[in-house]
Amino acid sequence: DLTDRIFCDALPQMVKDKMGSLDIVINNAGIITRGPLPEASDKDITLSMAVNIEAPLRLCRASIPIMAGQGGGIIVNTSSCWGLRPGPNHPIYVMTKAALASLTQCLGRDHAHQNIRVNAVCPNEVDTAMLRSGFEARGLDPLKAIDDLNASVPLGRIADPQDITDVITFLASDAARYMCGSLVEVNGGKPVI
């Protein structure tokens, strides 16, 4: 439960204790809140902030001293293209993903000297259960909505989860050894408009 502060604060040390080291942290959890800000409930705001900002912040805060003590490590955050260029009617989501992108750049700069590389993947639309349930919640047919999105992407389709996983795997590998504080867009050629 990433809304549990005590859990988030303790998780990196629990992993190190169990595995012997903490080499890679992938902050991939996220939720999306849709709609204009005046319609957002306090619950929506609190949950979005807890999952999209506070959990990765706490996990990074607890992981960095462990990684520094063992000579380095890698953190990959999942932000969003929307965190770099806001889209319409998602102000809470956009704000939280922009905060995570900014945190990534700050930590990348601040901890590079400790051999800790912090980067973020910034996907556009990805064919996930979260995307499909969002369409359903708005009364849309998910298959038709995804077909419409596919037509808007220069590469002809939205991302599937493997497209994002491949970039995360790259960022967590030695092939990305000179990347630190980078925000890598994975958008099929479709910028947020």
What would you call each of these model-derived segments?
Residues 40, 86-94, 106, 134:
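Active-site loop-to-helix junction immediately N-terminal to the catalytic Tyr of the SDR YXXXK motif
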Residues 37-38, 85-91, 113-114, 156, ...:
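Active-site loop immediately N-terminal to the catalytic Tyr-X3-Lys motif
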Residues 80:
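Residue(s) in the substrate-gating loop at a strand-loop-helix junction
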